[in-house]
């Protein structure tokens, strides 16, 4: 769906349907005169009498089919004092989904109707554009087209009140468009079956995007990983016929080549059986999305390059397939990490932290980061603690943690700080190695974060995002169908856009 602008005034607005966001108990024809001018028949629409503007309420009203704006969809936002950006985002997405179901090819969204709502004019433009595009997302690459499927809306136009489109509004719309593109890219990657997307293929896709969008991409194969002493990442992939890869991405726009980079590290386990510590069969198919962390990092770098963001950002994708087999790592194995420490493996289904620790060590050995953030579907313990709507955030840098929470909160991705409880580090001690890669079941998310922190050098600003639990949507929502959510992609993009760390 294209995003357009109409700025000749409401009398000249066009669209098969106009969205009209309304707070509870407001009179639709009085709150925004521009909407009344665009659809002068609205005051006598019978459905208007019954519309209350409650949260989630939608009312479709019809005028004469030959009019420039023949339909209005009233979108209820609930009580004004409770309206927020998250509610507006969800309401607009639900409205756009209804437009698709009805087969409307063009949608008009009056910008003056957004300007009167809380949240900030430009921010709401960005969020509504992003929400409208995400509302239409479906992973259909492997399916035949359905004969009776209604056509997708061709465009959504933001209507302005007879003025030039402000530069800030234009930029906000493009930011929303780019953010939605990044989320959809990450969802596509995480939805792709593991027989079609494995470490080499993910690396190939990264190279393609780098050529297309104009950022750098380097891939370390298994032989180069051996030279870099990445024994942990190699161990994760050694049971698979698909060798591991470390994908290195860099967006360094002109004038920013020498600045300290924001480094993003994503877990890229393209399929996770659990290895020798085999997972239960139920829902194992969802483990194709165990590379969501890597998908969000790749999507972020591509989106930054696409909008030519003035910030140097490096992304590392630690990619492997965790399979059982005669060569697979075993519980009790000891391997050597990239920082030189020996690591005892106790459970092969705790493989994500092994892949990440080598990538984190490599990042600090190669660059001096302004900040280092890893993102991973790491622990079921985090999902048990926080559920399916909030991700875990670990950091001993209060400023970095707050920036991440603010970035996520601005775009509907929420994080809850969890402790790096130092006494628990004692539980990672090993009798046979420098460190054991996991502790007891209790406090599992904390133990995993403490293991990663072991590989963070003194003075490096670091945060760990555990997105287990929020990476997969079981029931469809207005903003996401059932399946991979790409949670974290918008947070990372917002964080990278946010200026000096």
Curated annotation (Swiss-Prot):
Its EC number is 3.4.11.1, 3.4.11.10. Mn(2+) 2 binds at residues 267, 272, 290, 351. Mn(2+) 1 binds at residues 272, 349, 351. Keywords: Aminopeptidase, Cytoplasm, Hydrolase, Manganese, Metal-binding, Protease. It is found in: Cytoplasm. GO terms for molecular function: manganese ion binding; metalloaminopeptidase activity. Its cofactor is Mn(2+). This is Probable cytosol aminopeptidase. Coiled coil: none annotated. GO terms for biological process: proteolysis. It catalyses: Release of an N-terminal amino acid, Xaa-|-Yaa-, in which Xaa is preferably Leu, but may be other amino acids including Pro although not Arg or Lys, and Yaa may be Pro. Amino acid amides and methyl esters are also readily hydrolyzed, but rates on arylamides are exceedingly low; Release of an N-terminal amino acid, preferentially leucine, but not glutamic or aspartic acids. Presumably involved in the processing and regular turnover of intracellular proteins. Catalyzes the removal of unsubstituted N-terminal amino acids from various peptides. The active site is at residues 279, 353. Belongs to the peptidase M17 family. GO terms for cellular component: cytoplasm. PANTHER family: CYTOSOL AMINOPEPTIDASE, LEUCINE AMINOPEPTIDASE-RELATED. Binds 2 manganese ions per subunit. It holds the Pfam family Peptidase_M17.
């Amino acid at each position: 769906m294209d995003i357009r602008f109409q700025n000749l005034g409401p009398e000249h607005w066009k669209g098969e349907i106009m969205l009209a966001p309304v707070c509870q108990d407001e009179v639709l024809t009085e709150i925004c005169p521009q909407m009344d001018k665009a659809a002068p028949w609205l005051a006598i629409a019978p459905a208007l009498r019954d519309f209350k503007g409650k949260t989630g309420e939608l009312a479709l009203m019809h005028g004469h089919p030959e009019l420039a704006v023949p339909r209005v969809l009233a979108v209820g936002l609930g009580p004004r004092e409770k309206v927020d950006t998250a509610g507006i985002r969800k309401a607009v997405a639900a409205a756009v989904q209804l437009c698709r179901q009805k087969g409307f090819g063009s949608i008009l969204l009056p910008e003056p109707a957004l300007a009167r709502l809380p949240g900030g004019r430009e921010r709401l433009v960005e969020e509504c554009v992003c929400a409208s595009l995400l509302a239409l997302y479906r992973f259909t690459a492997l399916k035949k087209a359905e004969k009776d499927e209604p056509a997708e809306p061709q465009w959504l136009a933001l209507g302005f009140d007879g003025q030039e489109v402000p530069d800030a509004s234009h930029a906000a719309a493009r930011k929303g468009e780019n953010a939605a593109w990044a989320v959809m890219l990450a969802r596509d990657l995480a939805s792709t079956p593991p027989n079609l997307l494995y470490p080499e293929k993910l690396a190939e896709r990264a190279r393609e995007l780098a050529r297309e969008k104009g950022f750098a991409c380097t891939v370390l194969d298994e032989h180069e990983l051996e030279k870099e002493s990445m024994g942990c990442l190699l161990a994760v992939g050694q049971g698979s016929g698909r060798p591991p890869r470390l994908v290195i991405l860099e967006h360094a726009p002109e004038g920013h080549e020498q600045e300290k980079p924001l480094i993003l590290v994503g877990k890229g386990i393209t399929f996770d059986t659990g290895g020798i510590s085999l997972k239960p069969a139920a829902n194992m198919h969802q483990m194709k999305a165990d590379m969501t962390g890597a998908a969000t990092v790749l999507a972020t770098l591509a989106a930054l390059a696409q909008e030519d963001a003035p910030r140097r950002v490096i992304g590392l994708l630690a990619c492997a397939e965790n399979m059982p087999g005669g060569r697979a790592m075993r519980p009790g194995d000891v391997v050597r990490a990239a920082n030189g420490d020996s690591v005892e493996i106790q459970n092969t289904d705790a493989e994500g932290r092994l892949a990440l620790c080598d990538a984190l060590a490599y990042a600090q050995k190669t660059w001096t980061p302004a900040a280092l953030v890893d993102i991973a579907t790491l622990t079921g313990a985090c999902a048990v603690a926080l559920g399916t709507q909030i991700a875990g955030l670990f950091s001993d840098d209060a400023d970095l943690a707050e920036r991440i929470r603010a970035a996520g909160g601005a775009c509907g991705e929420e994080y809850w700080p969890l402790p790096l409880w130092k006494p628990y580090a004692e539980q990672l001690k090993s009798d046979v190695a420098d460190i054991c890669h996991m502790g007891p079941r209790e406090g599992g998310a904390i133990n995993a974060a403490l293991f990663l922190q072991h590989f963070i050098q003194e003075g490096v600003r670091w945060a760990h995002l555990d997105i287990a639990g929020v990476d997969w949507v079981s029931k469809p929502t207005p903003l996401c169908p059932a399946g991979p959510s790409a949670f974290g992609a918008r947070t990372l993009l917002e964080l990278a856009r946010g200026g000096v760390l």
